[in-house]
């Protein structure tokens, strides 16, 4: 495979030397290279190489400016129809240029230009089953995915994909989060993504059921970073993370824990052929590249919303953190505040359905809000029997087939969107629910906010009415853990570098007295979160009622 002439002579020479060095390394490791392909980014600085050894085992590496930042790493998976872990043969690859533009109502930039190179590598396993390995190279990172071809159902038994990270001159550091909290705050049965960030050394195990995506590797301080995550996950697959016990610098893909979602749902993904696995995303560069990259969105499918004029980001008053949901009268005070200060939304959180004559009360609040130029959003439990918090209601209304009826009803009232909580699992059945909610919400023009949920996986490009995800150790932990707990100033910087780098983050910022009392955060730090943390809906967590002695009115 030759590098396209558009990269110029220097890029071709560097890419050729990288491929030669990679092939020699494969030979020295005892796996004689018999086939190789190379794909370069448009600027020629970033390359991903794939080789097959004598046993038909595939591996890849990634280099930037001639420096290897992901060493020889395993590829492949085993399903009931395919075995791509050995005995694989490659056919002639095809390459195409990527040049796309799209607009986003949320995120790091509203106008996006996607330039990249894509290579499709046809494969056959030892039994003749056909598949493809699809590679992408962009200036800010690379990605790859498997495309299983054929007919009938295929269940994926294991995925061998790994990321072999080199140890830098001063020791590679790993910024990550445990997927779950063990027997502490978030048990494995409750799912994860809400634990505080941790800094580990390369190869150090994590005492939970995996490293949550995204995980950031600092190979050279201030200069060379590798961030690993996923994109374009659909109902054909499950959510994944990195195994809790790396093999030196090799970090492998891990499927969900059986206990997630209260043990309901299958761990192993199963889908009718043909189907694609999610993109395995590797952002490469300095810290600015990591923070500014939109690669997770860029790799996802284009928007399915024909007219996005109803998708309006904004600020939201929200009583749950400071005063619970309370009464309709309390929510009326929050509507008054939002109108007075020009905020676009008010979120009515859990247990609104337990009000006396709840549906009429909500409709009355909608009328009041509309008269003030404010829109309302409603909270829902995602469960269902999978939720670990069945006392938090409304319950069972976000499950098919009743979900569409519920959405049609509240859209008719004039509700602008929904917050759906307590998914508690990355299993395939929950991925189906995530996508089902987004598809149905599109039809009724409802904005969506996912809490107790998985990380952003590029869905915001495909479904731009998905305004934000939680998946962060956010401000609510001052409430849950109490004095002496909750995010520190350092953690908040880490959130911006790690979690917020892959998509909108509903941290629920700007709590004043409780953050100051808990971990000593000055008011200026809390206020800065509203700018530092990107979220399509920014839910301000402190009090916004009529009391002028506390909360935002006091400030």
Regions from the language model: what does each represent?
Residues 121, 540, 545-555:
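Glycan-recognition and catalytic regions of carbohydrate-active enzymes
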Residues 14-25:
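Bacterial N-terminal signal peptides
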Residues 515, 528-538:
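Catalytic domains of carbohydrate-active enzymes that cleave complex glycans
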Residues 349-517, 522:
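Aromatic- and carboxylate-enriched substrate-binding clefts and catalytic-loop regions
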Residues 2-15:
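Bacterial N-terminal signal peptides that target proteins for export
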